[in-house]
């Protein structure tokens, strides 16, 4: 998928403390003296699957931008240079989803295809945000049972019970406050944006172009708000609502509607006659698929199935999370169908998806939690208010069973220093948005809110497609052409448009 469902708490979408220069009105930053841009010592990347053309380096950035000469963190950065220097027009930064996505790995996965698609028009660059991958990390020292994805996603217990969710959320917040240190408090969208501009300086570029996906669209939007004159051609692929009141918590809540929008695509696939040939047909008619999955999850709530992973059964919430992940891309439909079949067959032993079979690394869990909790103040709501929200969401959206509105560690987090950035139409008209009509993580409704906020700065291409993350992934030829043409020629549709093919 184009974001990272096994490594990210929201869209992966999440947030952290916004520092002083990002105000509630998000005016462009006032220039002030900064340390000289560091030199990047490029070398061949050594991580698995890195293409021969991919180079890596390390970039020092301030822990605290109010103390730029103080303690420094290290970011892993990467590039794939244009193979056509005569046609190169600039540098394009690939902004990963998340929070929790690795820019370096994203460039490994997409770099060769992107370089071919853009015909060498750009040097392609990316970095691991602070807290991610080979960059400086932090840990909350969480117990393994608190680091499973079905724990971090705060799925309610059977019948919507949230007592354990409340206890776990408080436990995680206290552990992060105790063990995370100043590094963890620095894991914010605002600092990722500052780090990206520091990377621009180190590259010697006056401007950057960008392709941001999922949570990366929010990072991209904040950068374009803070540094509007340093943006060239800006692509936001699969956006959420940027309203400061909706950041993080609202993104997660929207996943209930997103799953409902996307499920018909899976249901049609799972009941197509072609599934008879590969033995994966789940029902006779598409309308039978949702009740089948909901009832199977309820059965697994009562009677979890032993799996091929010792000590980790398939629970109802495990099935629900596996479905949520599968809805990101059509390619994941078949593995989920096999899981459903095995869960129904008393003679079979279900095989858990790898993202559910083991605890997430402590460093990844810390990043996932901290960014969403640091960026914005979450309501310190009562247990009763969360129970009401979960009950209402479970009734309306049985596939997600109340998880998207449930309590998270953010309810027990320290109060952030600043308000999040407000995205506005103040800036150059150089943004192209790409949005799926049936996105399980960033529903079209949220993308339309981003479009409204950007005003004449943006044009929106809505793709008649399901899945999350479109360009060179889950999209269609029409949407891909629109992005490629914009990045290579600067031409955008004159007005918002739909892409049916």
Language-model regions: role of each:
Residues 305-321, 328-332, 358-366:
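Structural motif
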Residues 344-376, 380:
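Long, low-complexity segments enriched in small/aliphatic residues
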Residues 327-341, 345, 378-383:
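Short helix-capping/linker segments at secondary-structure and domain boundaries
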Residues 26, 340-342, 389-394:
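Short linear, low-complexity motifs centered on an aromatic residue
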Residues 32-318, 370-501:
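Gly/Pro-rich cap/lid or specificity-loop segments adjacent to the active site
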Residues 265-266, 318-323, 335-338:
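A general alpha-helix detector
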